[in-house]
Amino acid sequence: MKLTNSGFQRGYNPIVVEGDASDMNMDFGELLMEKGDTVSYNEPKECIYVLVTGKVTFRWADKEETVERKSCFHEDPILLHVPQNTAVELMCQSDKAEVSIQRTTNPKHFEPKLMKGEDLLCGSELRGAGLMNEASTRIVRTFLDRSNCPETNFFIGEVVSYPGKWSSFPPIPTRSLRSTSISSCPKMATAMPRWETPSIKFTTTTPPAWPTA
C-alpha cells in the first residue's frame, strides 16, 4: 500500500515496480488525466489499462473506441488488454479520468482486446452474502485468467468492499481454504488454478455507501 497526503498527481503515479522485491512480478500505478490529455505507451510487457472513472478514447492496433465509466462501484469494468510491444494511446474526453495500469513481463503473443462487462470471466459476482452476518459480503469482478486467456500472466479483477466488511476471505485455517469453493460463477472453476509463477493483482476499493444500483 502506498500512503500519500496529497493524493495522486496528474500523470502516471507508480505504486509498485516489478523487481523492487524478489516476489514483485508486476508494475502497478494510477494514471490521472484531464480533458485533452493524450498519453502514449509501447511497453515491452503485457499490459492492462483499466478505466476507473471518466471518459477515455483508447487507440491500439489500428482500432479506436471511446468508453465511459461514471462509477467503479456501481458499473462493470472496462479495460484494454494488450501483449508486449503494443502501441496504445489514451485521450481524456471528460474533465478528469483515472486509469489503473498493470504490467508484467510476458513474451507470449495474443490478440489485444477491449473488454467490457459481457467479456469478463465473471462480472459483478456477490460473494459472502448470507454468511457471518454479512461480515464478508463483497462484489468480485474477475476480468481474466488463463482459462479465458491462456497466454496471460495475470489473474486480475476488482473487489468492491462494503464499509466495515472484510474485503476477501475472513481469517480461516489454510486447511479449510483448500476445500472451499472460491466462486459461484459458472464461468469459473471451483478451485484456484495452480500456476507456476503468476502475477496476481486485485484492485480493492471501498465505496462511500452501500450501493443501491
Predicted features and spans:
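Conserved hydrophobic/aromatic beta-strand scaffold that supports enzyme active sites
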Residues: 28-32, 48, 79-81, 101, ...
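A short glycine-rich, His/Asp/Glu-containing loop-to-beta-strand
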Residues: 7-38, 134-181
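N-terminal functional module of multi-domain proteins
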Residues: 37-70, 75-79, 88
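Glycine- and acidic-residue-biased ligand/ion/polar-headgroup-sensing regions
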Residues: 43-63, 164, 175-213
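Histidine-centered metal-chelating micro-motifs
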Residues: 38-39, 77-90, 166-168, 211-213
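Ligand-binding loop in jelly-roll beta-barrel domains
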Residues: 71-110
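Surface-exposed beta-loop interaction hotspot
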Residues: 98-159
